[in-house]
């Protein structure tokens, strides 16, 4: 059967985030309890204007990516509890690896493998777990990306990531170094 790209708007629940950190053996779904996971590429620019020009110019020189997050404390969710503990214990330098899995972009001919992106993040809580009377315990902050993202595929059954190139038009995947 020929690959057909999705022809409708992709919804947030179709991009899953799995996370792993020191002390756990397999990535866990960072879903229940997280109410917002908004990426900000934050491009860095070198701006200027030459004396003979009317308009300023701007050249992108890199990125300072991060994720702003918010959520609710659900103690049986391993990822949410990890984020809560980092904030409440005022831990510094706590990292995790995130796999953003595009379930709308399956690997042609596979079962349970999808296009994915791997990033390393430091947890920087701003609200470590508090809220108003009668309300839910809220979590808010930033996941600051460290280093470059890697691109490839993710197997949701066994939690493995393989670096490579996914073709969004054909659904095909080539592992890095294969057929290059």
Describe the residue ranges of each PLM region:
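Solvent-exposed edge beta-strands and adjacent loop segments
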Residues: 2-74, 121-137
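Short secondary-structure transition/capping segments
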Residues: 8-14, 144-159
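Generic hydrophobic, helix-prone segments enriched in Leu/Val/Ile
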Residues: 17, 34-35, 83-91, 142
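Short beta-strand and beta-hairpin "edge-sheet" elements
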Residues: 32-37, 101-151
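Extracellular/virion structural assembly segments
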Residues: 54-120, 148-156
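Short, highly charged low-complexity linear segments
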Residues: 74, 132-144, 158-168
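Intrinsically disordered, low-complexity terminal/linker regions enriched in Pro/Ser/Gly
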Residues: 154-180
């Amino acid at each position: 059967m020929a690959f057909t790209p999705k022809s409708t708007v992709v919804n947030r629940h179709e991009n899953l985030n799995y996370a792993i950190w020191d002390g756990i053996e397999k990535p866990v779904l960072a879903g229940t309890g997280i109410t917002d996971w908004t990426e900000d590429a934050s491009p860095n620019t070198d701006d200027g204007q030459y004396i003979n020009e009317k308009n300023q110019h701007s050249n992108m020189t890199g990125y300072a990516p991060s994720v702003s997050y918010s959520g609710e404390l659900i103690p049986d969710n391993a990822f949410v509890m990890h984020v809560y503990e980092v904030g409440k214990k005022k831990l510094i330098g706590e990292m995790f690896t995130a796999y953003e899995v595009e379930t709308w972009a399956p690997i042609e001919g596979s079962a349970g493998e999808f296009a994915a992106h791997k990033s390393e993040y430091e947890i920087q809580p701003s609200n470590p777990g508090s809220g108003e009377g009668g309300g839910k315990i809220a979590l808010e902050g930033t996941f600051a990306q460290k280093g470059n993202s890697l691109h490839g595929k993710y197997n949701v059954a066994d939690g493995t990531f393989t670096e490579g190139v996914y073709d969004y038009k054909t659904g095909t995947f080539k592992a890095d170094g294969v057929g290059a």
